């Protein structure tokens, strides 16, 4: 009987793993992504893929599938040296004018000055929810991991698994939350010298082109959907690992990490910008330290 009980237990675990393992994880670039524009500026070197920006074009890539909830991660080494005027982005987005979007935007700077990481969130086409911070390392010398963890409870932006921003689901407070549109995963590099560096005061020096961002360790552990209109596979009663409270909510240690990031590296938070928002956005009233 003990042997039979053990067998049943193992089979139940296997069924659970299968039901929650419809995600896609760790793969080569071509398995998860494809060039979305300027194919000659997107170079797949096997383990590493590079996006190049010159005075002719930037470049970008996109995921082959769309997803509803899960975790996407990528390792990026940003443009070395003088990157002023350039923006490298890693983000998730749905389609259409009323789209949802989660953004990492890396704003280039002059040599010796720190990169600025800007995060932004769009829900139903409404954005303008920027936060900016300086990193606690040089992101141009080595690869670092940037992740977005998206569940029904929250959206968490992470750098090397350290949370830097959390957006909780506060629909019960009347605050919209991104939960009903499938998203693709994207990255791109482009010239944004009208605003990216010191408010547009520093322009791109094309004598330093090409500007190259490098990528590796492509991971998408998320619920892949068959069509953008059929979301039942991913938002029904079925439970995935990211639905567990121990995953979708920050631990005590992660909360301490987030507080440390905000205290030591945050340089802008839209919640405290009274010029842009004379009336404090509703979600800011409920995210005291987020």
From Swiss-Prot:
GO terms for cellular component: apoplast. Keywords: Apoplast, Cell wall, Cell wall biogenesis/degradation, Disulfide bond, Glycoprotein, Glycosidase, Hydrolase, Secreted, Signal, Transferase. One of its GO terms (biological process) is xyloglucan metabolic process. Disulfide bonds join 223-234, 271-284. Glycans are attached at residues 55, 109. GO terms for molecular function: hydrolase activity, hydrolyzing O-glycosyl compounds; polysaccharide binding; xyloglucan:xyloglucosyl transferase activity. It is an enzyme of class 2 (transferase). Highly expressed in shoot apices. In the vegetative and reproductive phases, it accumulates in the shoot apex region, where cell division is most active. In the reproductive phase, it is also expressed in flower buds, flower stalks and internodes bearing flowers. It is found in: Secreted, Cell wall; Secreted, Extracellular space, Apoplast. Residues 1-26 form the signal peptide. Residues 27-215 form the GH16 domain. Contains at least one intrachain disulfide bond essential for its enzymatic activity. The active site is at residues 101, 105. It comes from the Eukaryota. SUPFAM superfamilies: Concanavalin A-like lectins/glucanases (SSF49899). InterPro entries: Beta-glucanase/XTH, Beta_glucanase, ConA-like_dom_sf, GH16, XET_C, XTH. The keyword Nucleus does not apply. The record marks 103 as: Important for catalytic activity. Pfam families: Glyco_hydro_16, XET_C. Xyloglucan binds at residues 105, 118-120, 128-130, 194-195, 199, 276. It catalyses: breaks a beta-(1->4) bond in the backbone of a xyloglucan and transfers the xyloglucanyl segment on to O-4 of the non-reducing terminal glucose residue of an acceptor, which can be a xyloglucan or an oligosaccharide of xyloglucan. Its EC number is 2.4.1.207. Belongs to the glycosyl hydrolase 16 family. XTH group 1 subfamily. Catalyzes xyloglucan endohydrolysis (XEH) and/or endotransglycosylation (XET). Cleaves and religates xyloglucan polymers, an essential constituent of the primary cell wall, and thereby participates in cell wall construction of growing tissues. Involved in internodal cell elongation. This is Xyloglucan endotransglucosylase/hydrolase protein 9. It comes from Arabidopsis thaliana (Mouse-ear cress).
């Amino acid at each position: 009987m003990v042997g039979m009980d053990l067998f049943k237990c193992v089979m139940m675990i296997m069924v659970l793993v299968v039901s929650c393992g419809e995600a896609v994880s760790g793969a080569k670039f071509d398995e998860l992504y494809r060039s979305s524009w300027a194919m000659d500026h997107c170079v797949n070197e096997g383990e590493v893929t590079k996006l190049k920006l010159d005075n002719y074009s930037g470049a970008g890539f996109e995921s082959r599938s769309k997803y509803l909830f899960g975790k996407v991660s990528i390792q990026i080494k940003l443009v070395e040296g003088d990157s002023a005027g350039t923006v490298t982005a890693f983000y998730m987005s749905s389609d259409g004018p009323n789209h949802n979007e989660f953004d990492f935007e890396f704003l280039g700077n002059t040599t010796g000055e720190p990169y600025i990481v800007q995060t932004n969130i769009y829900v139903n086409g409404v954005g303008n929810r920027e936060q900016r911070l300086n990193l606690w390392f040089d992101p141009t010398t080595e690869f670092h991991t940037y992740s977005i963890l998206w569940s029904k409870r929250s959206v968490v932006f992470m750098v090397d698994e350290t949370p830097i921003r959390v957006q909780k689901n506060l629909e019960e407070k009347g605050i919209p939350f991104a939960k009903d549109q499938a998203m693709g995963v994207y990255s791109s590099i482009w010239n944004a010298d009208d605003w990216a560096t010191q408010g547009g005061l520093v322009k791109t020096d094309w004598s330093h082109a090409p500007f190259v961002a490098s990528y590796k360790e492509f991971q998408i552990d998320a619920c892949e959907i068959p069509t953008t209109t059929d979301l039942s596979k991913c938002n029904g009663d079925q439970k995935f690992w990211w639905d567990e409270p121990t995953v979708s909510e920050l631990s005590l240690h992660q909360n301490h990490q987030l507080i440390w990031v905000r205290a030591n590296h945050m340089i802008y938070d839209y919640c405290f910008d009274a010029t842009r928002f004379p009336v404090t956005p509703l979600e800011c009233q409920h995210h005291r330290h987020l």
